[in-house]
Amino acid sequence: MAALPVFIPAESFPSILSHETLINHFRTNLPKHSSTITSPVRQNYTVSSPSSLLLMPSWSSSSSLPYMGVKLVTYFPHNSSQNLPGIHGSYTLFSSTTGQTLATMDGTVLTLYRTSSVSGLGSKILARDDSQVLIMVGSGALAPHLIKSHLAAKPSLRRVIIWNRTPQRAQELAETLSKDPQHKEISFDSHDSLDQIIPLGDIISCATNSTVPLVKGEFLKPGTHLDLVGSFSHEMKECDDNAIQRGSVFVDNDTAMIEAGELAGAFERGVIKREDICGNLVELIKGDKEGRKSSTDITVFKSVGSGTVDLLTAQLVHETYLSRC
């Protein structure tokens, strides 16, 4: 008799998963499995405008990764009037051998962990090893995960400065993180002028839905690593053309060159060409492409996510959960 599927709620993730563990899991398994995982273009259905349903399937052909899965996300922007989140998600994991349902887990938290850990891995490879100051641009749900991922990736970090359009939210996040005993060696504070703190950053991580450039290239100091997470459409952009022009630009996968406003816009305006993109995450991990070449290089890492990292995250969550039962 087959085992019953398990349900893994959001509250269980912190006891199952750490950002450092997931970063290492990606570093080991992305080169091994990226060519064996199929991730079709996500399907987006308008169910009643402006609300929508998104489906993101992926499956592996490797016997060492016998899984397939699908992330289902609902987007209901008017939920704020009911004091509810606008986005909800779940992830269902199946056996690719028998087709049996193995687990259903919270898709929103899975996405927060996988997105931030991809950024953490980019930082681990591209940021300077003596980086001390992290600037966090944005203070939404993803921000604390990004901060924890960068801290795990670069143990040299000693100070985190948070900026948000609403200064109070940045201050509240800084106060919350400063109470975390895991980060008692780290100084957390907030600032209301982004232009003033950008020159301080060794690593700058952005997670916003901005349609106007927030990070200006003129303020980036030599040696900075710029991590761009928020944009996923041509209308969105978190930095200006100067930042893209000054940096060595890397992507998590090639879809970023199509979807991300910072890159698609730069291509259209002739600021850079597609051939100027220095490599993707798998190429960096494998050493096929060179990352940082000197301590004064500015590196830019743009990520948009993929079904591949969703599946690898679900694999780790499921297998870790079972090992502890």
UniProtKB/Swiss-Prot annotation:
Cellular compartment(s): Plastid, Chloroplast
Transit peptide: 1-42
Record's keyword annotation contains Plastid: yes
InterPro entries noted in UniProt: NAD(P)-bd_dom_sf, ODC_Mu_crystall, ODC_N
Lineage: superkingdom: Eukaryota
Major location (coarse): plastid
Keyword Oxidoreductase in annotation: no
Phenotypic effect of disruption: No visible phenotype under normal growth conditions. Mutant plants have compromised systemic acquired resistance (SAR). Mutant seedlings accumulate increased levels of proline.
Induction (UniProt): Induced by Pseudomonas syringae pv. maculicola. Induced by low water potential stress and treatment with exogenous proline.
GO biological process assignments: L-pipecolic acid biosynthetic process; positive regulation of systemic acquired resistance; systemic acquired resistance
Homology family: Belongs to the ornithine cyclodeaminase/mu-crystallin family.
Biological role: Involved in the biosynthesis of pipecolate (Pip), a metabolite that orchestrates defense amplification, positive regulation of salicylic acid (SA) biosynthesis, and priming to guarantee effective local resistance induction and the establishment of systemic acquired resistance (SAR). Converts delta-(1)-piperideine-2-carboxylate (P2C) to Pip. Mediates reduction of P2C and biosynthesis of Pip in systemic tissue and contributes to SAR establishment. Does not possess ornithine cyclodeaminase activity in vitro.
Protein name: Protein SAR DEFICIENT 4
Organism annotation: Arabidopsis thaliana
